[in-house]
Every structure is written in structure tokens, then in C-alpha cells.
């Protein structure tokens, strides 16, 4: 089994760019950024529970990474950079730390490296469980209205919140809930030590208004790019800034 994806060919021999979206996004999320890099092959993946992969069930990160590997093989992608946002960034970090073959470098935007104590995991498990129950039972417009009131999204304007709520409400609440629980921060290991031992380039992107993840970026051995005029979802709030950072990172 493989994940649904959209593939855009590039020049032969260059590493591919593999893009992983955030929770409730899909393969379209990164395209305004990725399509600025025509020289590279680009693969935009729908994670399980999302988009064209909505019907694919997973029990945890191991299943997600197994599906990611199978998808890369199916597209004959042998050398690649992983670029992931939020949930996609956590999947990318997990894959990198487990030694996914062919990985040339890692770019994470607003991805959490992991909780560091059991009490935090218990609290996160309860919180994600409450959200999952809401995704299963309530109209998605109501759930996402509240979702985007969370402190991490404080930099969004009312208009941006309204647009995101309308966009994300096109999802399937049941499959979102399942993926939220399967890949909760409560079940993700603390990756800091493994990330600090990576043998390939690791870059971290965060919006200048995203104080939480700017602080987390200092806890991993990554070169940090701060995206101006952006909060947690920097590639949506300032795509040109993220394109500039990726061009520097990839030397394109």
C-alpha cells in the first residue's frame, strides 16, 4: 500500500523534494512554495487520514513511515530532501531519526521534537482525545472554529481563521480523529538526542511571531531560519519568505 501523492518531474540527477503537510492539510498545502523549484522533482504527499489517503488507516508512526517508504519506492525516488510542516515535520523527523534510505537533508517548519516528561504526555493524550472526540461527533466548521483559537495560532487574523476553517472543514472528521490519536505528541518519543546526531543537513523554519516554536528550535541541532511576518504556519502566511529560505538551504 502507498500514500496518495502528486508528482511533478524535474531535472534528472537532482535530489527530489518530498513535502509533508500539517494536520488537516493535504498535498496542495506546499504547492505554492514547491512549484518555485522547477529544477527538482517534487512529491506532495497526502498523509493518512487526509485527502486522497483519507481511507488509509494507521496505528502509529511506524505505519506512517512504512507507507512513506513504500510511496517513495513507488515513485523511484532514491535521493531526496524531506520538507514537513507541523504534523508533517514530526513525521519527517521520525523518518530521519529511523534512517530512511536516500534522505539527503531535512527541513522542518514548526514541528515539535517531542515531549520530555510523562506528565506532559498524559496531559497531551487527554487533550488530543478530547479533540478527536469532537472531530468524530461535531460539525467540522464548529470544531475548526475552536481549533484555530488555540494559542499557537494567535497570529492569525479573523479573516485567515475564517478561511482556514472553511478549507479544513472539507475533511473527514472520523479519519482526522484517528490520525490525530495515532500520531499524537503523547506517543511520539523525544527526538532531541537523535536529531542532534543526524549526519546530514537539518534546518528548522519558524515564523517570527511563533514564540513557542522559536524556543523549541533552540533545543535541536538545526540551523534556524526565522520567517518574517509569519506565525506558526509560515509557508501559508509568508510563502515568499519560505521560498527564499529553501532556496538558500538547497542552494538553488
Swiss-Prot record:
EC numbers on record: 4.2.99.20
Keyword NADP annotated: no
Molecular function GO terms recorded: 2-succinyl-6-hydroxy-2,4-cyclohexadiene-1-carboxylate synthase activity
Catalytic activity: 5-enolpyruvoyl-6-hydroxy-2-succinyl-cyclohex-3-ene-1-carboxylate = (1R,6R)-6-hydroxy-2-succinyl-cyclohexa-2,4-diene-1-carboxylate + pyruvate
The protein's name in its UniProt record: 2-succinyl-6-hydroxy-2,4-cyclohexadiene-1-carboxylate synthase
PANTHER family (alphabetical): 2-SUCCINYL-5-ENOLPYRUVYL-6-HYDROXY-3-CYCLOHEXENE-1-CARBOXYLATE SYNTHASE, PROTEIN PHYLLO, CHLOROPLASTIC
Keywords recorded for this protein, A-Z: Lyase, Menaquinone biosynthesis
Alphabetical list of SUPFAM superfamilies matching this protein: alpha/beta-Hydrolases (SSF53474)
Disulphide connectivity of cysteines: none
Taxonomic source organism: Salmonella paratyphi B (strain ATCC BAA-1250 / SPB7)
UniProt xrefs under Pfam families: Abhydrolase_6
This protein's encoding gene: menH
Pathway: Quinol/quinone metabolism; 1,4-dihydroxy-2-naphthoate biosynthesis; 1,4-dihydroxy-2-naphthoate from chorismate: step 3/7; Quinol/quinone metabolism; menaquinone biosynthesis
Amino acid at each position: 500500500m502507498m500514500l496518495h501523492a502528486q508528482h511533478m518531474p524535474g531535472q534528472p540527477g537532482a535530489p527530489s523534494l518530498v513535502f509533508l503537510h500539517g494536520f488537516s492539510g493535504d498535498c496542495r498545502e506546499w504547492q505554492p512554495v514547491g512549484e518555485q523549484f522547477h529544477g527538482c522533482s517534487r512529491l506532495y504527499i497526502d498523509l493518512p487520514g487526509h485527502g486522497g489517503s483519507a481511507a488509509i488507516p494507521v496505528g502509529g508512526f511506524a505505519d506512517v513511515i512504512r507507507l512513506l517508504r513504500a510511496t517513495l519506492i513507488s515513485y523511484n525516488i532514491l535521493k531526496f530532501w524531506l520538507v514537513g510542516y507541523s504534523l508533517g515535520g514530526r513525521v519527517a523527523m521520525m523518518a530521519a531519526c529511523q534512517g530512511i534510505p536516500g534522505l539527503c537533508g531535512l527541513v522542518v517548519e514548526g514541528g515539535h521534537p517531542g515531549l520530555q516528561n510523562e506528565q506532559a504526555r498524559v496531559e497531551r493524550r487527554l487533550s488530543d482525545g478530547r479533540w478527536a472526540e469532537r472531530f468524530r461527533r461535531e460539525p467540522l466548521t464548529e470544531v475548526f472554529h475552536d481549533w484555530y483559537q488555540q494559542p499557537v495560532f494567535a497570529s492569525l487574523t479573523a479573516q485567515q481563521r475564517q478561511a482556514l476553517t472553511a478549507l479544513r472543514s472539507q475533511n473527514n472528521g472520523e479519519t482526522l480523529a484517528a490520525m490525530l490519536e495515532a500520531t499524537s505528541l503523547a506517543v511520539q518519543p523525544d527526538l532531541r538526542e537523535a536529531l542532534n546526531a543526524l549526519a546530514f543537513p537539518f534546518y528548522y523554519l519558524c515564523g517570527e511571531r511563533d514564540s513557542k516554536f522559536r524556543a523549541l528550535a533552540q533545543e535541536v541541532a538545526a540551523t534556524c531560519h526565522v520567517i518574517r511576518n509569519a506565525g506558526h504556519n509560515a509557508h501559508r502566511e509568508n510563502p515568499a519568505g519560505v521560498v527564499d529560505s529553501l532556496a538558500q538551504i538547497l542552494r538553488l
